[in-house]
Amino acid sequence: FKQNPEHFLAEASRLVKEQKASVIIEKLSYDPTNESYDVDIFTAEQKITDMTKAVSGVNKHIYDYVVVDSQGIERDFVTELDTSKEVVVYAKLPRGFLIPTPVGDYNPDWAISFKEGSVKHIYFIAETKGTMSSLELRGIEDRKIECARKFFEKINAEITSENVKYDVVTSYSKLMEVVSG
């Protein structure tokens, strides 16, 4: 505190906000509305895409290329999705696809549809991370993931007869463990 009071105050403020968010999220519930996403969210960003991060020559993505956030994990994930016999189609969710949370909007990474009969969960929303350790995920990001779990639980309970599974995965093999279980 004495050496850097500004840093101390900023860190204390961050910790208080994280704890406040945890308390709010414990009581959080989502209620369905009649709103829907316009299909334009999948095409609006295509005009301003950074093609240096694109993986081209893909067959099962909704486009013939995928723009990835990271060159390691997501690029490998795309390669495995595209060559998998179980995957029918997948999409990198656009930045406009947002789940509202008390700590800010959350944008999951992937929507994946699997071949019926090949896995237990046919429809899957995935967040790809380099690590599963909640200690290594930023506090706010971890809270958003917690909210997304509640969001998809509500969708499954009240809106759709088709079960939409959501989880955080570190690789394609981890994804297959989750959807097969």
Give the positions of each predicted feature:
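Intrinsically disordered, low-complexity, repeat-rich regions
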Residues: 1-106, 113-181
